[in-house]
Protein backbone atom coordinates (compact mmCIF):
# COMPACT_ATOMS: atom_id res chain seq x y z
CA UNK A 1 0.00 0.00 0.00
CA UNK A 2 1.37 3.39 -1.05
CA UNK A 3 0.14 6.47 0.84
CA UNK A 4 0.63 10.21 0.36
CA UNK A 5 -0.93 12.99 2.44
CA UNK A 6 -1.47 16.60 1.39
CA UNK A 7 -3.09 19.62 3.01
CA UNK A 8 -5.83 21.04 0.80
CA UNK A 9 -6.87 24.09 2.84
CA UNK A 10 -6.83 24.83 6.55
CA UNK A 11 -7.89 21.62 8.26
CA UNK A 12 -8.62 19.88 4.96
CA UNK A 13 -6.57 16.82 4.04
CA UNK A 14 -6.38 14.58 0.98
CA UNK A 15 -4.92 11.10 1.35
CA UNK A 16 -4.00 9.28 -1.86
CA UNK A 17 -3.74 5.50 -1.54
CA UNK A 18 -2.61 2.87 -4.04
CA UNK A 19 -3.68 -0.76 -3.57
CA UNK A 20 -1.52 -3.37 -5.30
CA UNK A 21 -3.22 -5.43 -8.02
CA UNK A 22 -2.30 -8.74 -6.38
CA UNK A 23 -3.94 -7.63 -3.10
CA UNK A 24 -7.14 -6.94 -4.99
CA UNK A 25 -7.07 -10.26 -6.88
CA UNK A 26 -6.33 -12.27 -3.75
CA UNK A 27 -9.23 -10.60 -1.92
CA UNK A 28 -11.57 -11.20 -4.89
CA UNK A 29 -10.61 -14.88 -5.11
CA UNK A 30 -11.09 -15.32 -1.36
CA UNK A 31 -14.54 -13.75 -1.49
CA UNK A 32 -15.55 -15.82 -4.53
CA UNK A 33 -14.65 -18.96 -2.56
CA UNK A 34 -16.98 -17.81 0.22
CA UNK A 35 -19.73 -17.09 -2.29
CA UNK A 36 -19.31 -20.51 -3.91
CA UNK A 37 -20.01 -22.19 -0.58
CA UNK A 38 -23.36 -20.43 -0.21
CA UNK A 39 -24.94 -19.94 -3.64
CA UNK A 40 -27.46 -22.21 -5.30
CA UNK A 41 -27.35 -22.49 -9.09
CA UNK A 42 -29.57 -24.80 -11.10
CA UNK A 43 -27.73 -27.97 -12.13
CA UNK A 44 -25.25 -27.89 -9.25
CA UNK A 45 -25.39 -28.98 -5.66
CA UNK A 46 -24.87 -26.32 -2.99
CA UNK A 47 -21.15 -25.82 -2.46
CA UNK A 48 -20.24 -27.71 -5.64
CA UNK A 49 -20.56 -24.89 -8.17
CA UNK A 50 -17.36 -24.60 -10.29
CA UNK A 51 -15.32 -21.44 -9.58
CA UNK A 52 -15.44 -20.32 -13.20
CA UNK A 53 -19.25 -20.38 -13.09
CA UNK A 54 -19.29 -18.45 -9.80
CA UNK A 55 -16.80 -15.93 -11.19
CA UNK A 56 -18.79 -15.47 -14.38
CA UNK A 57 -22.06 -14.86 -12.56
CA UNK A 58 -20.90 -12.99 -9.44
CA UNK A 59 -17.44 -11.72 -10.30
CA UNK A 60 -18.38 -8.11 -11.14
CA UNK A 61 -20.47 -7.52 -8.01
CA UNK A 62 -17.93 -9.29 -5.77
CA UNK A 63 -15.10 -7.20 -7.22
CA UNK A 64 -17.07 -4.01 -6.57
CA UNK A 65 -17.80 -5.01 -2.96
CA UNK A 66 -14.17 -6.04 -2.41
CA UNK A 67 -12.89 -2.72 -3.76
CA UNK A 68 -15.22 -0.82 -1.41
CA UNK A 69 -14.07 -2.90 1.55
CA UNK A 70 -10.39 -2.54 0.63
CA UNK A 71 -10.76 1.22 0.25
CA UNK A 72 -12.23 1.51 3.75
CA UNK A 73 -9.69 -0.79 5.39
CA UNK A 74 -6.68 0.75 3.65
CA UNK A 75 -7.88 4.23 4.62
CA UNK A 76 -8.08 3.20 8.27
CA UNK A 77 -4.61 1.65 8.03
CA UNK A 78 -3.29 4.83 6.38
CA UNK A 79 -4.58 7.26 9.03
CA UNK A 80 -3.24 5.01 11.80
CA UNK A 81 0.14 4.85 10.08
CA UNK A 82 0.23 8.61 9.46
CA UNK A 83 -1.24 9.40 12.92
CA UNK A 84 -4.10 11.42 11.45
CA UNK A 85 -7.28 12.17 13.43
CA UNK A 86 -10.18 12.76 10.99
CA UNK A 87 -13.10 14.97 12.02
CA UNK A 88 -16.39 13.97 10.42
CA UNK A 89 -17.14 11.49 7.65
CA UNK A 90 -14.53 11.09 4.87
CA UNK A 91 -15.35 11.58 1.19
CA UNK A 92 -13.99 8.80 -1.06
CA UNK A 93 -12.85 9.80 -4.55
CA UNK A 94 -12.30 6.59 -6.57
CA UNK A 95 -9.81 6.58 -9.41
CA UNK A 96 -10.21 4.62 -12.64
CA UNK A 97 -10.05 0.88 -12.02
CA UNK A 98 -8.49 -1.43 -14.62
CA UNK A 99 -8.48 -5.17 -14.19
CA UNK A 100 -5.06 -6.52 -13.25
CA UNK A 101 -3.59 -3.09 -12.44
CA UNK A 102 -2.89 -1.26 -9.19
CA UNK A 103 -5.84 0.85 -8.02
CA UNK A 104 -5.36 4.42 -6.84
CA UNK A 105 -8.01 6.46 -5.04
CA UNK A 106 -8.20 9.51 -2.78
CA UNK A 107 -10.00 10.31 0.46
CA UNK A 108 -10.81 13.90 1.42
CA UNK A 109 -11.64 14.90 4.98
CA UNK A 110 -10.95 17.40 7.75
CA UNK A 111 -8.78 16.84 10.79
CA UNK A 112 -9.14 18.03 14.36
CA UNK A 113 -7.15 21.19 15.05
CA UNK A 114 -3.99 20.98 17.09
CA UNK A 115 -4.98 22.79 20.27
CA UNK A 116 -2.28 24.27 22.45
CA UNK A 117 -3.91 26.01 25.39
CA UNK A 118 -2.65 29.49 26.14
CA UNK A 119 -3.58 32.60 28.06
CA UNK A 120 -5.12 30.79 31.02
CA UNK A 121 -3.33 33.11 33.45
CA UNK A 122 -4.96 36.14 31.81
CA UNK A 123 -8.53 34.90 32.29
CA UNK A 124 -10.42 37.05 34.81
CA UNK A 125 -13.34 35.62 36.77
CA UNK A 126 -15.54 37.32 39.36
CA UNK A 127 -16.84 34.86 41.94
CA UNK A 128 -20.20 36.02 43.33
CA UNK A 129 -20.26 36.12 47.12
CA UNK A 130 -23.92 35.97 48.10
CA UNK A 131 -26.19 34.51 50.73
CA UNK A 132 -29.94 34.13 51.08
CA UNK A 133 -31.10 36.79 53.57
CA UNK A 134 -34.33 37.00 55.54
CA UNK A 135 -35.37 39.82 53.20
CA UNK A 136 -34.82 37.52 50.20
CA UNK A 137 -37.06 34.91 51.82
CA UNK A 138 -39.70 37.60 52.47
CA UNK A 139 -39.60 38.59 48.80
CA UNK A 140 -39.99 34.98 47.71
CA UNK A 141 -42.94 34.48 50.07
CA UNK A 142 -44.58 37.58 48.55
CA UNK A 143 -44.02 36.09 45.10
CA UNK A 144 -45.64 32.81 46.16
CA UNK A 145 -48.63 34.71 47.57
CA UNK A 146 -48.96 36.71 44.34
CA UNK A 147 -48.94 33.50 42.31
CA UNK A 148 -51.87 32.23 44.41
CA UNK A 149 -53.68 35.58 44.55
CA UNK A 150 -57.28 36.22 43.53
CA UNK A 151 -58.50 39.39 41.82
CA UNK A 152 -61.12 41.84 43.10
CA UNK A 153 -62.60 44.95 41.52
CA UNK A 154 -60.83 48.21 42.30
CA UNK A 155 -62.49 51.61 42.43
CA UNK A 156 -59.26 53.57 42.17
CA UNK A 157 -56.91 54.24 39.26
CA UNK A 158 -54.91 51.45 37.62
CA UNK A 159 -51.31 51.03 38.71
CA UNK A 160 -48.31 48.83 37.88
CA UNK A 161 -49.50 45.61 39.56
CA UNK A 162 -53.19 45.69 38.67
CA UNK A 163 -55.12 43.75 36.05
CA UNK A 164 -57.26 45.60 33.54
CA UNK A 165 -59.91 44.64 30.99
CA UNK A 166 -59.90 46.90 27.94
CA UNK A 167 -61.15 47.42 24.42
CA UNK A 168 -58.58 49.07 22.18
CA UNK A 169 -58.16 50.20 18.59
CA UNK A 170 -54.75 51.11 17.20
CA UNK A 171 -53.93 53.27 14.19
CA UNK A 172 -50.86 54.49 12.34
CA UNK A 173 -51.17 57.70 10.31
CA UNK A 174 -54.91 57.58 10.93
CA UNK A 175 -55.31 54.07 9.50
CA UNK A 176 -56.16 51.00 11.57
CA UNK A 177 -53.70 48.12 11.18
CA UNK A 178 -54.03 44.35 11.34
CA UNK A 179 -53.84 42.97 14.88
CA UNK A 180 -54.32 46.41 16.41
CA UNK A 181 -57.86 45.90 17.70
CA UNK A 182 -59.28 43.85 20.58
CA UNK A 183 -62.38 43.57 22.75
CA UNK A 184 -62.43 42.50 26.42
CA UNK A 185 -58.66 42.14 26.39
CA UNK A 186 -57.37 41.14 29.85
CA UNK A 187 -53.94 42.58 30.65
CA UNK A 188 -51.93 41.84 33.79
CA UNK A 189 -49.83 44.95 34.22
CA UNK A 190 -46.09 44.87 34.86
CA UNK A 191 -45.26 41.78 32.81
CA UNK A 192 -43.93 43.55 29.73
CA UNK A 193 -46.43 41.95 27.34
CA UNK A 194 -47.21 45.14 25.44
CA UNK A 195 -45.02 47.58 23.52
CA UNK A 196 -43.24 50.31 25.53
CA UNK A 197 -45.57 53.08 26.67
CA UNK A 198 -48.80 51.09 26.38
CA UNK A 199 -49.13 50.17 30.05
CA UNK A 200 -47.77 53.54 31.15
CA UNK A 201 -50.64 55.17 29.24
CA UNK A 202 -53.21 53.12 31.16
CA UNK A 203 -51.83 53.89 34.63
CA UNK A 204 -53.75 56.58 36.47
CA UNK A 205 -57.03 55.91 34.65
CA UNK A 206 -60.17 54.43 36.23
CA UNK A 207 -62.76 51.95 35.01
CA UNK A 208 -65.29 53.59 32.69
CA UNK A 209 -62.82 56.04 31.17
CA UNK A 210 -62.04 56.25 27.45
CA UNK A 211 -58.77 57.86 26.39
CA UNK A 212 -56.08 57.89 23.70
CA UNK A 213 -52.41 57.06 24.19
CA UNK A 214 -49.43 57.72 21.92
CA UNK A 215 -46.77 55.03 21.55
CA UNK A 216 -43.95 54.09 19.18
CA UNK A 217 -43.35 50.56 17.96
CA UNK A 218 -39.80 49.30 18.60
CA UNK A 219 -37.41 49.12 15.65
CA UNK A 220 -37.08 45.36 16.26
CA UNK A 221 -40.87 44.77 16.23
CA UNK A 222 -41.83 41.59 14.37
CA UNK A 223 -44.30 43.24 11.94
CA UNK A 224 -42.26 44.92 9.20
CA UNK A 225 -44.92 47.58 8.48
CA UNK A 226 -44.95 48.75 12.11
CA UNK A 227 -41.24 48.90 12.96
CA UNK A 228 -40.38 52.29 14.45
CA UNK A 229 -43.83 53.71 13.61
CA UNK A 230 -45.70 56.16 15.85
CA UNK A 231 -49.18 54.90 16.72
CA UNK A 232 -52.31 55.97 18.58
CA UNK A 233 -54.48 53.62 20.64
CA UNK A 234 -58.03 54.52 21.64
CA UNK A 235 -58.66 52.64 24.88
CA UNK A 236 -61.90 51.92 26.72
CA UNK A 237 -60.96 50.88 30.26
CA UNK A 238 -63.80 48.55 31.30
CA UNK A 239 -62.47 47.07 34.52
CA UNK A 240 -59.61 47.54 36.99
CA UNK A 241 -58.75 44.73 39.42
CA UNK A 242 -56.23 44.44 42.22
CA UNK A 243 -54.67 41.37 43.77
CA UNK A 244 -56.02 39.97 46.99
CA UNK A 245 -53.13 38.09 48.55
CA UNK A 246 -53.83 34.93 50.57
CA UNK A 247 -52.88 34.90 54.23
CA UNK A 248 -50.15 32.52 55.36
CA UNK A 249 -52.64 30.12 56.89
CA UNK A 250 -51.94 26.49 57.74
CA UNK A 251 -54.05 25.38 54.75
CA UNK A 252 -52.16 27.68 52.37
CA UNK A 253 -48.75 26.60 53.67
CA UNK A 254 -49.54 22.88 53.35
CA UNK A 255 -50.03 23.38 49.58
CA UNK A 256 -46.24 23.71 49.38
CA UNK A 257 -45.52 20.37 51.03
CA UNK A 258 -44.87 21.77 54.51
CA UNK A 259 -46.57 19.14 56.65
CA UNK A 260 -46.75 21.06 59.93
CA UNK A 261 -48.34 24.05 58.18
CA UNK A 262 -46.24 26.56 60.12
CA UNK A 263 -44.80 29.81 58.81
CA UNK A 264 -41.41 28.82 60.20
CA UNK A 265 -41.59 25.53 58.31
CA UNK A 266 -42.51 27.32 55.08
CA UNK A 267 -39.68 29.82 55.50
CA UNK A 268 -37.22 26.96 56.09
CA UNK A 269 -38.43 25.12 52.97
CA UNK A 270 -38.29 28.27 50.84
CA UNK A 271 -34.80 29.10 52.11
CA UNK A 272 -33.59 25.56 51.35
CA UNK A 273 -34.89 25.77 47.77
CA UNK A 274 -33.43 29.25 47.28
CA UNK A 275 -30.03 28.13 48.57
CA UNK A 276 -30.07 25.19 46.16
CA UNK A 277 -30.89 27.53 43.26
CA UNK A 278 -28.24 29.96 44.48
CA UNK A 279 -25.56 27.27 44.54
CA UNK A 280 -26.33 26.35 40.94
CA UNK A 281 -26.44 30.00 39.85
CA UNK A 282 -23.02 30.74 41.41
CA UNK A 283 -21.57 27.66 39.76
CA UNK A 284 -23.02 28.61 36.36
CA UNK A 285 -21.85 32.23 36.65
CA UNK A 286 -18.28 31.16 37.40
CA UNK A 287 -18.34 28.51 34.69
CA UNK A 288 -19.63 30.88 31.99
CA UNK A 289 -16.88 33.42 32.76
CA UNK A 290 -14.17 30.74 32.74
CA UNK A 291 -15.36 29.34 29.40
CA UNK A 292 -15.73 32.81 27.89
CA UNK A 293 -12.15 33.62 28.92
CA UNK A 294 -10.90 30.29 27.57
CA UNK A 295 -12.56 30.90 24.20
CA UNK A 296 -11.30 34.49 23.96
CA UNK A 297 -7.73 33.43 24.77
CA UNK A 298 -7.63 30.57 22.25
CA UNK A 299 -8.59 31.24 18.64
CA UNK A 300 -8.77 27.85 16.94
CA UNK A 301 -9.87 26.57 13.54
CA UNK A 302 -13.01 24.46 13.64
CA UNK A 303 -13.78 21.57 11.27
CA UNK A 304 -16.87 22.37 9.19
CA UNK A 305 -17.99 18.75 9.57
CA UNK A 306 -18.26 19.16 13.35
CA UNK A 307 -20.23 22.39 12.97
CA UNK A 308 -22.60 20.67 10.52
CA UNK A 309 -23.13 17.84 12.98
CA UNK A 310 -23.85 20.25 15.83
CA UNK A 311 -26.28 22.21 13.65
CA UNK A 312 -28.21 18.98 13.02
CA UNK A 313 -28.36 18.36 16.79
CA UNK A 314 -29.65 21.89 17.45
CA UNK A 315 -32.19 21.60 14.63
CA UNK A 316 -33.62 18.40 16.07
CA UNK A 317 -33.74 19.87 19.58
CA UNK A 318 -35.59 22.94 18.28
CA UNK A 319 -38.05 20.79 16.33
CA UNK A 320 -38.72 18.61 19.39
CA UNK A 321 -39.39 21.66 21.56
CA UNK A 322 -42.10 22.83 19.17
CA UNK A 323 -43.53 19.40 18.36
CA UNK A 324 -41.88 19.06 14.95
CA UNK A 325 -40.55 15.94 13.27
CA UNK A 326 -37.25 14.93 11.64
CA UNK A 327 -38.22 16.33 8.23
CA UNK A 328 -39.26 19.68 9.69
CA UNK A 329 -36.04 19.83 11.71
CA UNK A 330 -33.89 19.52 8.59
CA UNK A 331 -35.89 22.30 6.90
CA UNK A 332 -34.98 24.84 9.59
CA UNK A 333 -32.43 27.37 8.20
CA UNK A 334 -28.89 26.48 9.25
CA UNK A 335 -28.16 30.19 9.74
CA UNK A 336 -30.34 30.11 12.87
CA UNK A 337 -27.95 27.70 14.56
CA UNK A 338 -24.56 28.26 12.93
CA UNK A 339 -23.09 30.68 15.48
CA UNK A 340 -24.27 28.64 18.48
CA UNK A 341 -23.08 25.40 16.87
CA UNK A 342 -19.60 26.79 16.19
CA UNK A 343 -19.27 28.03 19.75
CA UNK A 344 -20.34 24.68 21.18
CA UNK A 345 -17.75 22.90 19.04
CA UNK A 346 -15.02 25.36 20.07
CA UNK A 347 -15.89 24.98 23.76
CA UNK A 348 -15.93 21.20 23.41
CA UNK A 349 -12.52 21.12 21.74
CA UNK A 350 -10.95 23.46 24.30
CA UNK A 351 -12.38 21.68 27.34
CA UNK A 352 -11.40 18.38 25.75
CA UNK A 353 -7.82 19.60 25.60
CA UNK A 354 -7.99 20.71 29.24
CA UNK A 355 -9.19 17.22 30.17
CA UNK A 356 -6.45 15.60 28.08
CA UNK A 357 -3.56 17.72 29.33
CA UNK A 358 -4.64 17.36 32.97
CA UNK A 359 -5.43 13.64 32.52
CA UNK A 360 -8.82 14.14 34.12
CA UNK A 361 -11.34 11.39 34.77
CA UNK A 362 -14.84 11.78 36.19
CA UNK A 363 -14.72 11.86 39.99
CA UNK A 364 -17.35 9.32 41.11
CA UNK A 365 -17.84 11.10 44.45
CA UNK A 366 -18.65 14.29 42.53
CA UNK A 367 -21.01 12.36 40.26
CA UNK A 368 -22.82 11.01 43.32
CA UNK A 369 -23.03 14.49 44.87
CA UNK A 370 -24.43 15.99 41.65
CA UNK A 371 -27.14 13.34 41.45
CA UNK A 372 -28.06 13.84 45.12
CA UNK A 373 -28.22 17.62 44.64
CA UNK A 374 -30.46 17.26 41.59
CA UNK A 375 -32.65 14.66 43.33
CA UNK A 376 -33.19 16.91 46.36
CA UNK A 377 -35.59 19.02 44.29
CA UNK A 378 -38.01 16.07 43.98
CA UNK A 379 -40.57 14.77 46.45
CA UNK A 380 -38.79 11.41 46.82
CA UNK A 381 -35.04 11.94 46.26
CA UNK A 382 -34.16 8.29 46.94
CA UNK A 383 -36.40 7.18 44.07
CA UNK A 384 -34.64 9.57 41.66
CA UNK A 385 -31.19 8.45 42.84
CA UNK A 386 -32.11 4.80 42.33
CA UNK A 387 -33.51 5.57 38.86
CA UNK A 388 -30.22 7.20 37.85
CA UNK A 389 -28.11 4.38 39.29
CA UNK A 390 -29.91 1.84 37.12
CA UNK A 391 -29.67 3.86 33.89
CA UNK A 392 -26.23 3.73 32.26
CA UNK A 393 -26.99 6.53 29.81
CA UNK A 394 -28.07 8.92 32.56
CA UNK A 395 -25.02 7.99 34.64
CA UNK A 396 -22.72 8.66 31.67
CA UNK A 397 -24.39 12.04 31.12
CA UNK A 398 -23.81 12.93 34.77
CA UNK A 399 -20.18 11.80 34.52
CA UNK A 400 -19.77 14.18 31.58
CA UNK A 401 -21.22 17.00 33.70
CA UNK A 402 -18.77 16.18 36.49
CA UNK A 403 -15.85 15.99 34.08
CA UNK A 404 -16.75 19.36 32.59
CA UNK A 405 -16.85 20.86 36.09
CA UNK A 406 -13.41 19.41 36.81
CA UNK A 407 -12.09 20.90 33.56
CA UNK A 408 -13.50 24.32 34.48
CA UNK A 409 -11.85 24.05 37.91
CA UNK A 410 -8.53 23.30 36.20
CA UNK A 411 -8.96 26.53 34.20
CA UNK A 412 -9.89 28.48 37.34
CA UNK A 413 -6.78 27.20 39.12
CA UNK A 414 -4.69 29.30 36.70
CA UNK A 415 -7.12 32.19 36.20
CA UNK A 416 -7.35 35.44 38.16
CA UNK A 417 -10.35 34.90 40.45
CA UNK A 418 -11.69 37.76 42.56
CA UNK A 419 -14.69 37.81 44.88
CA UNK A 420 -17.61 40.16 44.24
CA UNK A 421 -20.34 40.73 46.84
CA UNK A 422 -23.70 40.28 45.12
CA UNK A 423 -27.35 40.14 46.14
CA UNK A 424 -29.55 37.11 45.52
CA UNK A 425 -31.85 39.02 43.14
CA UNK A 426 -28.97 40.52 41.18
CA UNK A 427 -27.38 37.12 40.58
CA UNK A 428 -30.64 35.36 39.69
CA UNK A 429 -31.57 38.15 37.25
CA UNK A 430 -28.21 37.64 35.50
CA UNK A 431 -29.19 33.99 34.98
CA UNK A 432 -32.51 34.89 33.36
Curated annotation (Swiss-Prot):
Which InterPro entries does the annotation name?
PPIase_dom_sf, PPIase_FKBP_dom, Trig_fac, Trigger_fac_C, Trigger_fac_C_sf, Trigger_fac_ribosome-bd_bac, Trigger_fac_ribosome-bd_sf, Trigger_fact/SurA_dom_sf
Q: Has keyword Cell inner membrane?
A: no
Q: Which Pfam families match?
A: FKBP_C, Trigger_C, Trigger_N
One Gene Ontology cellular component annotation?
cytoplasm
Where's it mainly located?
cytoplasm
Described purpose of this protein according to its UniProt entry: Involved in protein export. Acts as a chaperone by maintaining the newly synthesized protein in an open conformation. Functions as a peptidyl-prolyl cis-trans isomerase.
User: What's the record's remark on domains?
Assistant: Consists of 3 domains; the N-terminus binds the ribosome, the middle domain has PPIase activity, while the C-terminus has intrinsic chaperone activity on its own.
Show the HAMAP family listed in the entry.
Trigger_factor_Tig
In the record, the note on similarity to other proteins reads:
Belongs to the FKBP-type PPIase family. Tig subfamily.
User: Mind telling me what this protein is named?
Assistant: Trigger factor
Record organism:
Cronobacter sakazakii (strain ATCC BAA-894)
The opening ranks of the lineage are: Bacteria, Pseudomonadati, Pseudomonadota, Gammaproteobacteria, Enterobacterales
